[in-house]
């Protein structure tokens, strides 16, 4: 019952009509009344009040009790309340009722009910008829009408048992509830009874305590003094009533008698030990000494004992005289108490067991004494000096346990100690072995495990606990340091001599006993172990002091975990050194890894063949690199390595490419650390080489990479055919390449900073936040040549970045691209430019003395041509031999122009009239033919200049003029226009033609001329009469045309033509004969040729409307034009120039895309027209 019942015993529930229902059971509080029950009478002093504690308390307070008393201890503390018991019983009843209903429902029904023939009241109930009695009271069914089937009886039995069980339970609950009505008063009485019994027990305990105290003080009781005896002794010095026996003392022995008896005793001892008891003497006592009437048995390193005899009878016992220990430290003499104890004990053993028992007893006693001396010294060491609080000494009967390094942190879980005890000397089967007596035995337990075959020397002659501990600790230190050394030395870093590791062991241990590990350069971590404390410490290096030593000391197993901590110490030192190392401004150490740890493991463990050691990675980045690239230094026992890696896509996802760098730890050493310079060189070369690999792979170009040199230079070899593919000539033939088979790319590292970049780096970084310039790399490409003799015209330096070595016969191309940009596109462009240069140089070489090269570089080629050709006069049809020589003209080819190759001619050059065609040819496959073309066409163009000059006088009289139209480099048209009543016009085409391997100029009337076949035409008549039918110096008439040599014949031929046509100037035209001339049917040209021909004819048709216009060359006016003619000429010239440019572009595209079709079309055109020349400018 809870305490609330005691405190509110006089109260009732505030609402008696209300009751709480728990699991269907109504719970009502039971009021505990304090009124006396009926029939109870009062006592002698008045009525009896049951449980009225409140009145009693008020009476005590009224009596003047000022101090409150302690509350009585209630027996109902921690007792289950009645309400909980009733609620649990209600829950139990409810659950049992549910189980009963389910069990009854699962039982089978009676057969009569299933058949519809139920009897008795069951049937009546089903049919709705209830037997009623008097006044409507239902009648009880008679026994004959009850359902007596076995199923129903079984169900009724179950219900009856259930009701009986619950009834018994609730009856008990009712009894408890009824009793609980007076539980408050009864509980208080019990509390009071318990309290009084406890007080009574205190009286009994006090009594017995006094009795025990009296018994325990008996030793302190002082007897009453004997004053009478004391007075007599102090007065007279004797007591007369004490008895005196009157014995006479024996006379003392003389010296002779003493020597005699001693001699007799020695003789008897010799006889007894030699003859009678020699076999019973223990083996350690076989060597003994007899002197002074005694025999002295000695056990080396243990004790000496003196024995004697008192009788000549050999069966009598020996007697103990003296016992001395002969080990040190030991007491010089025994105390009286110890001597008396040993003497009594030894004499008893000699009487019962003889000499063998005496030896065993004294031997065991000595061993125990030695163990005690070891224990005494151990306790003294643990309290003084360096051993204070480092030892824990424990005596175990005759054994001694000494735990050392008790305060060391790494030995708390696995303690180490030595155990010194006595070995029985018995064999394995428990039998005594006389040859092996008991002895001291030492056992060493290291880290909680016994060390077998430790072979620790134990000096029992000179006992020194400190020396013994030092010997054991020396073995332990050697074990720890050797285990750490073996663990480290087996790793690849030290096995491959990449780091220094040494072990020094001294016995006994001292500070020289240490493990020395190289951290970086001359820096070493010297690990030692304190022999007294057992703690690890680092010597000679304050940075490696308390922190890292404590970390090792807290390890549970230093043997396996200390190597990892030492490696972490090296990582820390390397990281600290790298962060404090002076570095360029563009280098920085990243605070965290730019890629996940799994990717870093993939890189570091790519070189791990068998084991994967823990590692530490330091990441660096150069601000002049692309963000995807970074450098990494991995430190591990597998080896320190430097890596260059490229992140894939977004930084922080994965590593795409990584490469190991050949950087050694010595590169980090001061004062001149080459780390960052080597790192920059290695990483820059790798980035550009990898970028070039990607480009080569994408373009399906074969390549190979050679092994990198120690200085970081890398080499890639590609096929020159891939950089310079063989291109067919316009005639369809394929020219052999001039370059060697391979092109070697050498990556030389970062390019030196330019002065502008240096000045920018020195600027104030706080002024403007600038984006750092990209790092540039130096790359050299070596292109060999197959025939060095062809390149004798080249100088050593062709350009700022292009060199030619005549002795070795190769070109050296130097590049300085941005880091990570690669050079494959630049290399291809530069090699193609070099190929273009080689073609021109080859062409210049083939021309020999006809062309004089002045400057040959990759950007510009300057040469002159024209020396040695004779000059002819147009007024004289025949050239004057031995006349003035023509001057040389200079040509400048700008190979580095923005629009391609630019042809620059000096003022007055005859070829200025075809400058547009020259520039177009220079940017096509005909570039290498330009030098030959200049030489081949120079006589023609100089003759054309003289032709223009000869018509100046005729033009001044308005009698006629002439001008030249250039349709291509090898096709031009001369138009002669004469004045008169009707405009008279003739056009002559000049084209080269190959006959028997010789190139000649062929001149004929243009096919577009309508009077080409008109025999009555005045131009046909005079040309046929004075030109087509004659031959001269270097030219020959062909009936309707003429051919001339390119060098000596074209000038005289043009002079003859010019003289014939000028003769018609100023003459009236002949009368026109109306004859219809049937034009020959021309073959249908190819559609492409028709389009080109239409474009070419269009400007000619426009020119025919006004034959007296100025010269056809834009910007050239050799004659004084009439008013209005100059503007008309300029407009027409610009229109012709635009048409020619469009025509050139169309021709070039047509030639590049449909080269074969163009060749076939040219062949068909040549077959249809025999007058079409074949142009070969070589």
From Swiss-Prot:
Q: Which GO terms describe its molecular function?
A: transcription coregulator activity
Its keywords, alphabetically, are: Activator, Nucleus, Transcription, Transcription regulation
Cellular component GO terms, alphabetical: core mediator complex; mediator complex
Q: Name one Pfam family in it.
A: Med14
| InterPro entries per UniProt | Med14_N (IPR055122), Mediator_Med14 (IPR013947)
Provide the GO biological process annotations: regulation of transcription by RNA polymerase II
**Region Disordered: what ranges?**
1-50, 1064-1178
Q: Where in the cell is it found?
A: Nucleus
Identify the main location. nucleus
Q: Where is the composition biased (Polar residues)?
A: 1-12
Presence of the UniProt keyword Nucleus in the record: yes
Question: Where does this protein have compositionally biased stretches of type Low complexity?
Answer: 1074-1112, 1119-1164
Primary role = Component of the Mediator complex, a coactivator involved in the regulated transcription of nearly all RNA polymerase II-dependent genes. Mediator functions as a bridge to convey information from gene-specific regulatory proteins to the basal RNA polymerase II transcription machinery. Mediator is recruited to promoters by direct interactions with regulatory proteins and serves as a scaffold for the assembly of a functional preinitiation complex with RNA polymerase II and the general transcription factors.
Matching PANTHER family, A to Z? MEDIATOR COMPLEX SUBUNIT (PTHR12809), MEDIATOR OF RNA POLYMERASE II TRANSCRIPTION SUBUNIT 14 (PTHR12809:SF2)
Question: Subunit arrangement?
Answer: Component of the Mediator complex.
Family, similarity comment: Belongs to the Mediator complex subunit 14 family.
What is the name of the protein in this document?
Mediator of RNA polymerase II transcription subunit 14
Where does this protein come from, organism-wise? Chaetomium globosum (strain ATCC 6205 / CBS 148.51 / DSM 1962 / NBRC 6347 / NRRL 1970)
Lineage of producing organism? Eukaryota, Fungi, Dikarya, Ascomycota, Pezizomycotina
Q: Which gene encodes it?
A: RGR1
């Amino acid at each position: 019952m809870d305490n609330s019942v005691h405190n509110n015993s006089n109260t009732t529930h505030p609402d008696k009509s209300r009751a709480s229902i728990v699991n269907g059971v109504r719970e009502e509080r039971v009021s505990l009344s304090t009124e006396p029950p009926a029939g109870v009478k009062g006592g002698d002093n008045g009525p009896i009040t049951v449980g009225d504690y409140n009145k009693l308390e008020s009476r005590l307070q009224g009596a003047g009790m000022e101090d409150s008393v302690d509350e009585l201890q209630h027996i109902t503390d921690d007792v289950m309340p009645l309400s909980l018991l009733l609620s649990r019983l209600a829950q139990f009843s409810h659950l049992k009722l549910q189980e009963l209903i389910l069990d009854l429902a699962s039982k089978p029904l009676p057969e009569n009910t299933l058949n519809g023939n139920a009897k008795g009241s069951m049937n009546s109930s089903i049919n709705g008829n209830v037997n009623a009695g008097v006044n409507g009271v239902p009648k009880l069914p008679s026994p004959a009408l009850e359902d007596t089937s076995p199923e129903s009886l079984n169900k009724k039995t179950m219900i009856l048992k259930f009701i009986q069980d619950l009834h018994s339970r609730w009856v008990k609950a009712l009894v408890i509830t009824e009793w609980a009505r007076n539980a408050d008063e009864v509980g208080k009485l019990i509390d009071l009874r318990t309290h009084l019994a406890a007080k009574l027990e205190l009286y009994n305990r006090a009594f017995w305590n006094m009795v025990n105290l009296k018994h325990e003080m008996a030793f302190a009781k002082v007897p009453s003094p004997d004053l009478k005896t004391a007075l007599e002794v102090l007065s007279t010095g004797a007591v007369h009533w004490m008895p005196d026996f009157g014995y006479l003392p024996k006379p003392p022995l003389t010296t002779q008698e003493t020597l005699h008896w001693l001699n007799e005793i020695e003789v008897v001892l010799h006889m007894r030990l030699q003859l009678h008891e020699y076999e019973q003497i223990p083996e350690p006592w076989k060597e003994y000494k007899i002197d002074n009437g005694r025999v002295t048995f000695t056990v080396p390193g243990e004790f000496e004992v003196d024995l004697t005899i008192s009788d000549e009878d050999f069966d009598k016992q020996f007697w103990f005289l003296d016992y001395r220990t002969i080990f040190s430290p030991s007491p010089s003499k025994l105390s009286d108490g110890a001597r008396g104890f040993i003497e009594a004990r030894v004499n008893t053993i000699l009487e019962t067991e003889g000499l063998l028992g005496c030896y065993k007893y004294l031997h065991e006693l000595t061993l125990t004494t030695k163990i005690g001396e070891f224990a005494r010294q151990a306790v003294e060491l643990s309290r003084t000096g360096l051993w204070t609080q480092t030892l824990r000494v424990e005596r175990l009967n005759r054994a001694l346990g000494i735990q050392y390094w008790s305060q060391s942190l790494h030995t708390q879980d696995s303690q180490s100690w030595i155990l010194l005890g006595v070995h029985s000397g018995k064999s394995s089967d428990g039998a005594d072995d006389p040859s092996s007596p008991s002895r001291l035995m030492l056992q060493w337990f290291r880290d909680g495990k016994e060390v077998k075959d430790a072979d620790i020397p134990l000096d029992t002659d000179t006992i020194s606990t400190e020396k013994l501990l030092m010997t054991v600790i020396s073995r332990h230190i050697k074990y720890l340091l050797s285990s750490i050394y073996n663990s480290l030395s087996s790793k690849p870093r030290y096995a491959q001599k990449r780091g220094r590791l040494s072990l020094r062991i001294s016995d006994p241990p001292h500070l020289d006993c240490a493990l020395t590990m190289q951290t970086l350069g001359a820096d070493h971590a010297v690990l030692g172990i304190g022999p007294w404390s057992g703690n690890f410490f680092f010597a000679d290096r304050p940075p490696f002091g308390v922190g890292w030593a404590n970390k090792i000391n807290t390890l549970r197993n230093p043997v396996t975990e200390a190597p990892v901590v030492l490696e972490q110490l090296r990582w820390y030192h390397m990281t600290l050194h790298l962060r404090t190392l002076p570095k360029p401004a563009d280098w920085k150490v990243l605070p965290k890894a730019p890629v996940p740890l799994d990717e870093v493991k993939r890189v570091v463990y790519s070189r791990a063949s068998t084991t994967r050691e823990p590692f530490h990675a330091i990441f660096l980045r150069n601000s002049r690199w692309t963000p995807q690239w970074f450098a990494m230094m991995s430190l591990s026992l597998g080896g320190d390595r430097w890596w260059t890696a490229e992140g894939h896509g977004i930084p922080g996802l994965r590593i795409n490419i990584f490469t190991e760098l050949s950087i050694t730890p010595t590169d980090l050493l001061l004062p001149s650390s080459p780390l960052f310079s080597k790192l920059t060189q290695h990483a820059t070369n790798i980035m550009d080489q990898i970028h070039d690999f990607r480009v080569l792979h994408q373009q399906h170009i074969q390549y190979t990479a050679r092994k990198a040199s120690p200085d970081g230079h890398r080499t890639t070899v590609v096929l020159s055919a891939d950089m310079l593919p063989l291109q067919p000539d316009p005639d369809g033939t394929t020219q052999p390449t001039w370059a060697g088979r391979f092109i070697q790319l050498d990556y030389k590292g970062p390019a030196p900073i330019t002065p502008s970049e240096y000045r920018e780096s020195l600027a104030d970084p706080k002024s403007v936040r600038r984006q750092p310039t990209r790092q540039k790399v130096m790359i050299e490409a070596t292109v060999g040549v197959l025939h060095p003799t062809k390149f004798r015209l080249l100088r050593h330096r062709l350009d700022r970045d292009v060199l030619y070595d005549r002795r070795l016969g190769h070109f050296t191309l130097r590049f300085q691209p941005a880091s990570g940009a690669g050079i494959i596109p630049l290399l291809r462009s530069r090699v193609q430019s070099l190929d273009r240069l080689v073609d021109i140089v080859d062409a210049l070489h083939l021309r020999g003395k006809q062309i004089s090269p002045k400057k040959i570089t990759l950007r510009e080629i300057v040469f002159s041509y024209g020396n040695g050709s004779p000059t002819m006069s147009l007024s004289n049809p025949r050239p004057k031999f031995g006349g003035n020589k023509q001057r040389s003209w200079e040509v400048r080819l700008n190979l580095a122009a923005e629009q391609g190759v630019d042809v620059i001619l000096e003022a007055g050059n005859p070829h200025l009239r075809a400058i547009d065609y020259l520039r177009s040819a220079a940017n096509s496959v005909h570039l290498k033919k330009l030098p030959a073309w200049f030489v081949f066409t120079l006589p023609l163009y100089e003759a054309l200049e003289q032709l223009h000059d000869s018509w100046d006088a005729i033009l001044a009289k308005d009698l006629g003029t002439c001008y030249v139209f250039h349709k291509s480099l090898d096709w031009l048209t001369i138009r002669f226009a004469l004045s008169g009543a009707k405009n008279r016009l003739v056009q002559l085409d000049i084209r080269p033609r190959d006959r028997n391997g010789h190139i000649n100029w062929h001149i004929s009337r243009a096919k577009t001329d309508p009077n080409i076949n008109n025999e009555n035409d005045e131009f046909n008549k005079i040309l046929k009469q004075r030109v087509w039918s004659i031959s001269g110096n270097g030219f020959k008439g062909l009936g309707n045309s003429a051919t001339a040599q390119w060098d000596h014949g074209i000038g005289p031929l043009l002079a003859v033509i010019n003289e014939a046509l000028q003769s018609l100037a100023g003459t009236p035209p002949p009368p026109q004969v109306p004859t219809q001339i049937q034009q020959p049917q021309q073959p249908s040209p190819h559609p492409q040729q028709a389009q080109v021909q239409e474009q070419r004819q269009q400007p000619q048709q426009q020119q025919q409307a006004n034959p007296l216009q100025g010269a056809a060359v834009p910007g050239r006016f050799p004659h004084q034009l009439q008013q209005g003619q100059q503007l008309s000429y300029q407009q027409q010239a610009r229109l012709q120039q635009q048409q020619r440019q469009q025509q050139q572009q169309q021709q070039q595209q047509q030639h590049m895309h449909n080269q074969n079709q163009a060749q076939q079309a040219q062949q068909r055109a040549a077959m249809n027209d025999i007058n079409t020349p074949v142009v070969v400018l070589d």
